[in-house]
């Protein structure tokens, strides 16, 4: 095991503070409408230019191991805020830096670190409760566009396209961000339920010009097994032929004789039919088949529930207005399932999302939720160069997270004003002793840091602006983009309450832990001498090269 170096007390805290400040100073340069860019070196290819706080934080590793520990802890603040709300990483970093700097000053002055932390925690709880009181619901498209615009560093086109996407697919719909091929941002929406399985045979195509199979007012047979014997299907096919409606078969697989017979029947026009594999694998396949059944008002034919193909009737089949199949995807439009059943299924999936700890499972469950509840929108980001494309895509993703957070917990006045207004919650707050009161006062100063930094980045005088904002009330604040004062909400400067809340909670959590640090342990880096050149042994046979 490698030897370790241990630092204690002030010498440990000083080293940690250096790391905190290096990382935070790089990140906070990006805050606000007049925030600057940061250029990140890449091991190959062009450097990346970004105004995204978490991207800057992730790149920073310091040579000194003790300083690096401080930097990594602040990086954790940014990641925590990003994981919970998807945005607010720069605000969280600025808050953490302010808490740590103020806190370590108090520790150096002889305050008890544990009581300081208790004071910080008390004040944080009070401010979070006040932020919830200040939050206004965010329901209309205009407010959603404004939140998106602010989060995308004042790019109105991004705010607008996100608001349009949310309007089209609903608040629960899935919105994905992809790299486009043009200069402009584009939005495409898939309505209905789409899953990534295409037709099993090109002979099902009935629209050769677009290479799709389209079924109008079809019945849907959902089967949880492979179908290879046509005899099993005959009772259902006869019933469907009598009803004179097309049929879509969704099964684990349709193969051999069964598939051949379906193709022949389809080509002869006896039964208009198409077959597709069920989406997903294993348990997820069963769950997705059940989703389709609920959406279309059908029943999954499964031996687990005592149903077999031979006994299936038309009552077991689902209904939809239209189904479109291409080579890769199947889209079911306007399923005939009961609204109450769909809502119950949505609530069930939502509960599973809350309970799961795996990010992959969460993503898949959210996709299922969107397919049932709304639809899927794809934002294709357009840009002039590859470097700009990457930077813009990161901003669109940030803005998307921010708008989702705004819909979830409402909006508060932006530009650091909400935190200043929430200070009233701790104006009378008292701790159990004087050291806790210092912790509360410390947070009172720290929550002004985001507003001060926004003003500093815009070239203003932070103290003057903070005083003027404090003299106002309600939504009154400073618009750094136009250097004017006024009602932040009327000026369209909004922050999601969830983003502000999670930024403060993450900063107070890590800040409190750093203030109470007493020792740091790191590996000793030994300078290994460079290996000597091997003896070439005279290199016989090379005498004539002089």
Swiss-Prot record:
Subcellular location: Cytoplasm
Keywords (A to Z) from UniProt: ATP-binding, Chaperone, Cytoplasm, Isomerase, Nucleotide-binding
Highest taxon of the lineage: Bacteria
Chief localization: cytoplasm
Enzyme Commission number(s) of this protein: 5.6.1.7
Keyword Aminoacyl-tRNA synthetase among record annotations: no
Catalysed reaction, written as an equation: ATP + H2O + a folded polypeptide = ADP + phosphate + an unfolded polypeptide
Enzyme superclass (EC): isomerase
Entry-linked InterPro entries: Chaperonin_Cpn60_CS, Cpn60/GroEL, Cpn60/GroEL/TCP-1, GroEL-like_apical_dom_sf, GROEL-like_equatorial_sf, TCP-1-like_intermed_sf
Binding site for ATP: 30-33, 51, 87-91, 415, 479-481, 495
SUPFAM superfamilies named in the record: GroEL apical domain-like (SSF52029), GroEL equatorial domain-like (SSF48592), GroEL-intermediate domain like (SSF54849)
GO molecular function: ATP binding; ATP-dependent protein folding chaperone; isomerase activity; unfolded protein binding
Keyword match Isomerase: yes
Gene Ontology CC: one annotated term: cytoplasm
Record-level GO BP terms: protein refolding
Chain coiled-coil ranges: none
NCBIfam families hit by this protein: GroEL (TIGR02348), PRK00013.1 (NF000592), PRK12849.1 (NF009487), PRK12850.1 (NF009488), PRK12851.1 (NF009489)
HAMAP family (alphabetical): CH60
Record note on quaternary structure: Forms a cylinder of 14 subunits composed of two heptameric rings stacked back-to-back. Interacts with the co-chaperonin GroES.
Sequence similarity: Belongs to the chaperonin (HSP60) family.
Role: Together with its co-chaperonin GroES, plays an essential role in assisting protein folding. The GroEL-GroES system forms a nano-cage that allows encapsulation of the non-native substrate proteins and provides a physical environment optimized to promote and accelerate protein folding.
The protein's name in its UniProt record: Chaperonin GroEL
């Amino acid at each position: 095991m490698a030897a370790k170096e241990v630092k204690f007390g002030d010498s440990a805290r000083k080293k940690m503070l250096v790391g905190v400040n290096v990382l935070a100073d790089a990140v906070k340069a990006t805050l606000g409408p007049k925030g600057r860019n940061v250029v990140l070196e890449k091991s190959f290819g062009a450097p990346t230019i970004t105004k995204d706080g978490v991207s800057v934080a992730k790149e920073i590793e310091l040579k000194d191991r003790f300083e690096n520990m401080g930097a990594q802890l602040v990086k954790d603040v940014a990641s925590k805020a990003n994981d919970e709300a998807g945005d607010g990483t720069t605000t969280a970093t600025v808050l953490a830096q302010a808490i740590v700097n103020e806190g370590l000053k108090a520790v150096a002055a002889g305050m008890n670190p544990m009581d300081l932390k208790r004071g910080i925690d008390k004040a944080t709880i009070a401010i979070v409760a006040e932020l919830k009181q200040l939050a206004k619901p965010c329901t209309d498209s205009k407010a959603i566009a404004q939140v998106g615009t602010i989060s995308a560093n004042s790019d109105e086109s991004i705010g607008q396209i996100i608001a349009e996407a949310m309007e089209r697919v609903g608040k629960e719909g899935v919105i994905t961000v992809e790299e486009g091929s043009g200069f402009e941002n584009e939005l495409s929406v898939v309505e209905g339920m789409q899953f990534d399985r295409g037709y099993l045979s090109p002979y099902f195509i009935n629209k050769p010009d677009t290479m799709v199979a389209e079924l109008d007012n079809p019945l849907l047979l959902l089967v949880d097994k492979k179908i290879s014997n046509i005899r099993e299907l005959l009772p259902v096919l006869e019933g469907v032929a009598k009803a004179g409606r097309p049929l879509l078969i969704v099964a684990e697989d349709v193969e051999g004789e069964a598939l051949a017979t379906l193709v022949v029947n389809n080509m002869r026009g006896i039964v208009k039919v198409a077959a597709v594999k069920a989406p997903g694998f294993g348990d997820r396949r069963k769950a997705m088949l059940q989703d389709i059944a609920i959406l279309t008002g059908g029943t999954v034919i499964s031996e687990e529930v005592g149903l077999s193909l031979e006994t299936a009737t038309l009552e077991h089949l689902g209904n939809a207005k239209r189904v479109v199949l291409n080579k890769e995807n199947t889209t079911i439009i306007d399923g005939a399932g009961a609204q109450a059943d769909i809502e119950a299924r949505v609530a069930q999936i939502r509960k599973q999302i809350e309970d799961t700890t795996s990010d992959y499972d969460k993503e898949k469950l959210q996709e299922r939720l969107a397919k049932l509840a709304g639809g899927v929108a794809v934002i294709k980001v357009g840009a002039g160069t590859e470097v700009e494309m990457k930077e813009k895509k990161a901003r669109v993703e940030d803005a998307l997270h921010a708008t989702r957070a705004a819909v979830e917990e409402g909006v508060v006045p932006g530009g650091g004003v909400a935190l200043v207004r929430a200070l009233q919650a701790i104006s009378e707050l008292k701790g159990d002793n004087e050291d806790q009161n210092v912790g509360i006062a410390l947070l009172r100063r720290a929550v002004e840091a985001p507003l001060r930094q926004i003003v500093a980045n815009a070239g203003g005088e932070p103290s003057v602006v903070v005083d003027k904002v404090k003299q106002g009330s309600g939504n009154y604040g400073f618009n750094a983009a136009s250097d004017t004062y006024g009602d932040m909400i009327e000026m369209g400067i909004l922050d999601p309450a969830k983003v502000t809340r999670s930024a403060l909670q993450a900063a107070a959590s890590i800040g409190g832990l750093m203030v109470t640090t007493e020792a740091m342990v790191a590996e000793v880096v030994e300078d290994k001498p460079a290996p000597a050149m091997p003896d070439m042994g005279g290199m016989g046979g090379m005498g004539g090269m002089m």
